[in-house]
Amino acid sequence: MKSNDTLTNKELLAVKDIITKTVDCERIYLFGSFVDNLQTKGSDYDIYVVIKNEDENPVFIEQNIYRNLSKRKGRHTPVDVLVENKNKFDNLCTLPTMERKIAREGVLLYDVAQSA
């Protein structure tokens, strides 16, 4: 991701704010084409949200996030969201999975431990 892309940074900050207001999360990662500097005009933001509560349904959380993201006014880069609880995400990070790649190479947009 180009650090001087002001529009991208503003959009990602707005996405992060919407997500943190929607769900009690541990971490939010950006991954995919914007991290790898392979984005094109039609690229979307790939966002992975790690939630605290194991009892919450990740699919229900995703739906709430999408609903709140859809309320943004004006033109925006599309957002693709994945949600998983902290324990499962951390376990998947020990295996050769997408989650491990995200934890190692993704851009950490939010970490509850750093914002406290």
Predicted regions, residues:
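Catalytic core of pol beta-like nucleotidyltransferases
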Residues: M1-R27, V35-K41, I51-A116
